[in-house]
Every structure is written in structure tokens, then in C-alpha cells.
């Protein structure tokens, strides 16, 4: 492990709190020690931290608040500053500076903002500063949220050009069944490609404080691995888990990176949270999956959500299965007008056209 590597460490709420209602500072101190040790060896470390709402609730004395988005955002606004203060305080013991990055889905959906976020993150790393990343929960609405820090960590790994992504949780890894209810469940140590069978056995996190269960960790691993980034799911309370993961020692479930990773633009398409979705017919599904064809308006049955031209959208088949993500050539209003129509009719219907396809195959990733 002599060469410098970049590691993204995602710390879930259940890891930071130990399953309690407050931050477990002793455990966070130990996690920082492990990161600082790798930093001193010349490695580049990125932290994706949950816990802002838990920190806010603790700081305010566990107030009785209505179960509303505004209440969560209030707690996040208070807790975010407490959280970054804690990271800064602990890393400063080792003479390490931290830099905070708060992101929303909009930063990932827009290619220019995605590149700006990438440049900022890499500038921090180039100057030996540890980026501390969280979703901007104080302002993010359901429409602009990435949704969970597992998927955010996969996007951060792509932005950072990471070698490895470590998802620390309250479970030792991915099991063949739920270990809490099935004593015969076995730890899956290595995964080479994520399929529907693997997704089916992914259970939910035992913690009620976070938003990400094992299913979202599989989503994150899928995104990272297809971008050429090894991903490990491991228990946050395992001794020296961060250093051992960096060394390549078995610490949980290792999802091995795709041998031929996606090129940079397609990494963005694959990782960006979809702004909307299209449901397509059987003919379009077959053309996309079997021939790698572009999506024509003729094959579109339903347009869901509101999105602009140039945004990433999800493409589903008639059974609701996610078959592809791609960049839309038309906005949602235009697609509703031309859905089910032949491409030759686009100009007559809209009064303009951006070409005959709704999503070009060069701007599409098969899921």
C-alpha cells in the first residue's frame, strides 16, 4: 500500500450514534484516528457524514417537534454546524484541516455544477485537506434531495476519482439472509456484479435514525463499481476497519469494480439522481436492452415528473423495472406531446425539433 490512494468513507447515523440518540464521540475519535493515520501515510481521505439531524436534536435537548420536513430541516440547520465543528476539532489534533461541502441533487443533475463540485473537491484533496461532505438537509426538499448518504457517497467517490468507497454501517456486511431473524445467514465476502437476486436479499438497517438501509448501499455499490471503484460494506465498530479496508484485507463485503469502467460522461449519467422518468413499451425495451438503440418518442407510454432538456432521466419498462438512465433531448412538457408519435411528426407537433430521438444511445446507460 505504498502508492497514494483516495478513499471515501461514508459514516451512517447508526455508526456515529452507536444506535443511541446522541453522537458517540469516543467512537468518532477512533474513526478520526484511523483516517489521520492513513492521511499521514500520504493517502487522500474524503468523509461523507450523516448525523446532522441527530446532532441538532441533541444540542437542542431533544425537543418535542412535529413530524414535518420543516422540523427536520430546523434540526439539520442547528446540527450541521455542530457536526462540522466536531470533525474540525478532532482532525485538528493531528494538524489536519477539513473543508465542508454541502450538496443537493441539483449539484449532481447539472453537468456544469457537477464539474464545479468535482474541481472543488479535488482542490481540497490536492491541498491535503479532508473534505467533509453531507447533503444540504437544511434547504433540500424531496424534489432536490439525493435521498440518502449512501448514494451521495457513491457520487462523492466519482467526483473524487476515488480508488475505494467504504460504507460503514451497523452490520458486518451483506448476508445471504437477514441475520437478525435467520441464524443460518452467511456473510457474502465478495461480489462481482449486482443482480436482482442480490437486491432481493438486501434488508433494511436496524437503526431508526438514518435514511439508508442495505438496499441503498447496494445502489451505491452498483454506481461506484461501474465507475471503476471498489466498494466495501463493513461494520463501523470493527477495530481498525478503515485501515484494513485500505490495505485490501477482508473486513466485510467487497464489491469488486467493473473491469471496464464507464468513461467520465457516462459516470455522471449513471450516478446523477434522475429528474424524472419515462415508461416505455415492449418494443422500445427490447430495442434498448438487446440492440443498444436510442429511445424514440414512439416507444414512450408515460412521462413522469417535470424536467428540462439535458437532465438525466430514468427509463422504465411497462412492469416498472429500471432499464436505463439517459440525458433527455426534450423537456417533460414536450415529451408528453410527442409520446407515442413518429419522429417525423415532432416538428409539426412542437414547432421545432432537437432531432428524432428522445434519448440518444450515446447519452444512455443500461442499468
UniProtKB/Swiss-Prot annotation:
Pathway: Amino-acid biosynthesis; L-proline biosynthesis; L-glutamate 5-semialdehyde from L-glutamate: step 1/2. It catalyses: L-glutamate + ATP = L-glutamyl 5-phosphate + ADP. Transmembrane segments: none annotated. One of its GO terms (molecular function) is ATP binding. Keywords: Amino-acid biosynthesis, ATP-binding, Cytoplasm, Kinase, Nucleotide-binding, Proline biosynthesis, Transferase. Belongs to the glutamate 5-kinase family. This is Glutamate 5-kinase. The lineage of its organism: Bacteria, Pseudomonadati, Pseudomonadota, Gammaproteobacteria, Enterobacterales.
